[in-house]
A protein has these predicted regions:
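Phosphate-binding and hydrolysis-coupling loops of NTP-dependent motor/remodeling domains
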Residues: 137-202
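P-loop NTPase catalytic phosphate-binding loop
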Residues: 1-65, 75-157, 170-171
Length: 202
């Protein structure tokens, strides 16, 4: 649903990095999507992203030197064309990058560590059952350090990446309906705590 919503925007760069399970194969024929499945595909995409990331990073650092506030930096970066990079399965992607013959882990580590406020976004799915296999990888640690996302399936107590302290113990151990996601750190009583994805129920 998020991917489809992004494609409705006119000026946007979209990339899909799909695992061998081909969960996003429907987008392989989408002209506006860079659909990557092989090591060579992924390497070429990041090779093309490198100069753009460097340019934006220089701009960000210049604004930091000018003691600009984060809101000002973000406002400026929002004038740049956004990049949305969708990864079908983080538990596949991280080992894939580190085992690749073509070296791209250094660049990706740098992007995820320093890429905040660049208007470049990485979106991925992760089954909590596979989380332990990724611990220790710098790409994974940087990815989850942002503490942003949506937890689907209920039983939020099993998710140690996000904080759901605003929920009671009982609520944190309840399963949830298909398509209903829980937002972390929704401490403000007026903030949204759940999202509903209607299409996921079909």
């Amino acid at each position: 649903v998020f991917l489809q919503a992004v494609l409705e925007k006119e000026d946007v760069h979209v990339c899909v990095m799909d695992s061998p399970r081909s969960e996003f194969k429907a987008y392989a024929v989408e002209e506006r999507v860079d659909y990557c499945t092989t090591e060579e595909d992924v390497f070429e995409f990041f090779k093309g992203l490198l100069p753009e990331f460097k340019r934006r990073n220089v701009l960000k650092n210049q604004m930091l030197e000018q003691e600009k506030e984060e809101d000002e930096i973000l406002d400026r970066m929002m004038q740049e064309t956004p990049y949305f990079i969708f990864i079908s399965d983080l538990s596949w992607f991280v080992p894939f990058i580190y085992k690749a013959t073509l070296d791209m882990k250094g660049f990706l580590e740098n992007v995820l560590e320093k890429g905040r406020l660049h208007n470049i976004y990485f979106i991925s799915e992760l089954d909590m059952k596979n989380k332990s296999n990724l611990m220790g990888y710098k790409i994974y640690e940087s990815f989850v350090s942002y503490k942003t996302g949506i937890h689907f399936g209920g039983k939020t107590a099993e998710n140690t990446l996000f904080s759901f302290d605003y929920m009671s113990y009982t609520e944190q151990n309840k399963p949830e309906k298909v398509g209903v996601g829980q937002l972390p750190n929704a401490m403000d009583k007026d903030s949204a705590k759940k999202v509903v994805v209607p299409r996921a129920r079909r």
